[in-house]
């Protein structure tokens, strides 16, 4: 028996060593092939006190995240090491980059060499299931095709939807100057666009269920972000509050999906009886939820896709809106300039879609908000194949680097947007006037790029611009209340204002 056990242990050891040796040989052969054909050079690595597990880096980033300094810590890292480098994080070797040419390669020119990857699906599936946010291949393509009509120019140009929610915001803002956190309001428009019904979290009549949905959804997103930061140790993450939040979100959305499925059956029956609508019939607004239900998609899959898009569309809009109001409330000089432009162009009337495009300084203000506070400040892809990135190798970081299949590449938009060599010595300062002459390319990516560019970017831009105009028309002064400290990150899958956006 002892002999057999010894043989088994020895066999396991030999097998493990063989895999390690073969993996090393295989990697070196692949590296040499790319080195000879593409001129790849060694990627720089961040210096570490623990070259085996990189515990010093792992705990450093954990502390930074706890102190709401995660993005700032990476910015310091890039300044110290370079625009592209490798880091060992608890046994995971990760490539970090804020180099525009590398980001362009990952998202556009070498798009087919990269994917979202299984780890993101594993980390987010408990809340989101599988959908356009975390899927690859045909699942992603199909979901993307269905959601695209939700954000066409015709849909986005329907400003009546935004005005409805602006009026609800005006109702919610106390007349006596009491402060309110405007970040909560942005959930309403997101659910209205996707569900055809609002969560109404800001209305005085809002139900406890609606408010709990807003809380549970945010709590679920926090849990996903925590899992992602834990890397390969995410499988050991357990938080009963996160699990409860996921269940509540599912129950809430399942009720909405059930209503949509019922409406879809009625729609098909009516279409069968009246295949040609009358000439004077009012055209129905397209919603992603109704489209999925009418296509006959299973309710569970509808829920998954809806939650995936809610993350992408709602959170993008929410982060942009909250950051814009955060800056506006703290900069009375820009309020004066914006009011002057709005008064000259609109003469007191509500803006049209075309008006919003003609408000030059407003557009500069929104662009600068996106530069300073990109809604998705960092993102990641996994290499599907052995490939090459154009920068990061050699002593100066200008040579190509080999990226093996399965390699995680994290690209940092936040720090790229604040690089002084790309944006000037005032890159860290909020200055909308820079957009009078600035014409950036891949150094400015607030909504991603390539085939996976954010489908809701026009929705976010139009909503933010419209709401800013209406706030400035309605109120003679917008003041920041509560915490007057500088902007602090609240980083999950997106990045919002950590201290909230308390205004009156």
Swiss-Prot record:
Transmembrane spans: 5-25
Residues bearing carbohydrate: 150, 385
Annotated positions binding heme: 454
Cross-referenced InterPro entries: Cyt_P450 (IPR001128), Cyt_P450_CS (IPR017972), Cyt_P450_E_CYP52_ascomycetes (IPR002974), Cyt_P450_E_CYP52_fungi (IPR047146), Cyt_P450_sf (IPR036396)
Its EC number(s): 1.-.-.-
GO CC, one annotated term: membrane
Functional pathway: Secondary metabolite biosynthesis
Pfam families (UniProt xref): p450 (PF00067)
GO biological process: mycotoxin biosynthetic process
Cofactors demanded by this protein: heme
A GO molecular-function annotation: oxidoreductase activity, acting on paired donors, with incorporation or reduction of molecular oxygen, reduced flavin or flavoprotein as one donor, and incorporation of one atom of oxygen
Record membrane topology: Single-pass membrane protein
Compartments reported by the entry: Membrane
Catalytic activity, as annotated: soppiline B + 3 reduced [NADPH--hemoprotein reductase] + 3 O2 = soppiline C + 3 oxidized [NADPH--hemoprotein reductase] + 4 H2O + 4 H(+)
Keywords of the record: Glycoprotein, Heme, Iron, Membrane, Metal-binding, Monooxygenase, Oxidoreductase, Transmembrane, Transmembrane helix
Database matches in PANTHER family: P450, PUTATIVE (EUROFUNG)-RELATED
Family: Belongs to the cytochrome P450 family.
Known role: Cytochrome P450 monooxygenase; part of the gene cluster that mediates the biosynthesis of the alkylresorcinols called soppilines. The biosynthesis starts with the HR-PKS pspA-catalyzed carbon chain assembly through nine chain elongation cycles, using acetyl CoA and malonyl CoA as a starter and extender units, respectively, to produce the polyketide soppiline A. In the first round, the KR, DH, and CMeT domains work to produce 2-methyl-2-butenyl thioester.
Descriptive protein name: Cytochrome P450 monooxygenase pspC
Organism: Penicillium soppii
Lineage: Eukaryota, Fungi, Dikarya, Ascomycota, Pezizomycotina
């Amino acid at each position: 028996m002892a002999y057999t056990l010894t043989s088994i242990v020895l066999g396991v050891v030999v097998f493990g060593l063989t895999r390690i040796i073969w993996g090393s040989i295989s990697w070196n052969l692949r590296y040499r092939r790319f080195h000879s054909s593409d001129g790849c050079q060694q990627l720089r690595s961040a210096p570490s006190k623990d070259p085996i597990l990189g515990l010093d880096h792992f705990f450093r980033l954990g502390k930074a995240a706890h102190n709401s300094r995660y993005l700032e810590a990476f910015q310091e890292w890039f300044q110290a090491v370079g625009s592209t480098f490798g880091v060992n994080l608890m046994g995971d070797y990760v490539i970090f980059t804020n180099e525009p040419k590398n980001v362009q390669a990952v998202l556009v020119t070498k798009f087919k060499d990269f994917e979202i990857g299984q780890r993101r699906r594993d980390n987010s599936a408990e809340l989101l299931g599988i959908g356009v946010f975390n899927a690859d291949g045909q699942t992603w393509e199909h979901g993307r095709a269905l959601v695209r009509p939700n954000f066409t120019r015709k849909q986005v140009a329907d400003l009546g939807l935004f005005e409805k929610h602006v009026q609800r915001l005006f109702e919610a803002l106390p007349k006596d100057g009491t402060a309110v956190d405007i970040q909560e309001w942005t959930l309403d428009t997101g659910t209205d666009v996707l569900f055809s019904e609002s969560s109404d979290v800001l209305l005085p009549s809002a139900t406890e269920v609606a408010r709990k949905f807003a809380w549970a959804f945010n709590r679920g997103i926090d849990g996903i972000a925590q899992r992602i930061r834990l890397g390969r140790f995410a499988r050991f993450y357990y938080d009963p509050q996160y699990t409860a939040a996921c269940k509540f979100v599912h129950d809430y959305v399942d009720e909405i999906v059930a209503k949509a499925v019922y409406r879809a059956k009625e729609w098909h029956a009516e279409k069968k009886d009246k295949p040609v609508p009358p000439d004077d019939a009012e055209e129905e607004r397209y919603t992603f939820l109704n489209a999925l239900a009418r296509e006959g998609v299973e309710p569970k899959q509808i829920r998954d896709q809806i939650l995936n898009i809610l993350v992408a569309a709602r959170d993008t809009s929410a982060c942009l809106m909250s950051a814009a109001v955060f800056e506006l409330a703290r900069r009375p000089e820009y309020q004066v300039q914006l009011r002057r432009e709005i008064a000259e162009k609109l003469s007191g009337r509500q803006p049209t879609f075309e008006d919003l495009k003609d408000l030059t300084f407003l557009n500069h203000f929104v662009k600068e908000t996106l530069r300073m506070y990109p809604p998705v400040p960092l993102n990641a892809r996994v290499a599907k194949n052995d490939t090459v990135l154009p920068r990061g190798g050699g002593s100066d970081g200008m040579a190509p680097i080999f990226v093996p299949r399965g390699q995680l590449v994290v690209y940092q938009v936040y720090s790229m947007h604040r690089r002084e060599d790309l944006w000037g010595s005032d890159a860290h300062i909020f200055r909308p006037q820079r957009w009078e002459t600035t014409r950036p390319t891949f150094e400015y990516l607030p909504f991603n790029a390539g085939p996976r560019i954010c489908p809701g970017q026009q929705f976010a831009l139009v909503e933010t611009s419209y709401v800013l105009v209406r706030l400035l028309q309605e109120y003679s002064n917008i003041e920041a209340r509560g915490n007057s400290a500088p902007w602090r990150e609240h980083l999950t899958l997106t990045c919002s204002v950590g201290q909230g956006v308390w205004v009156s």
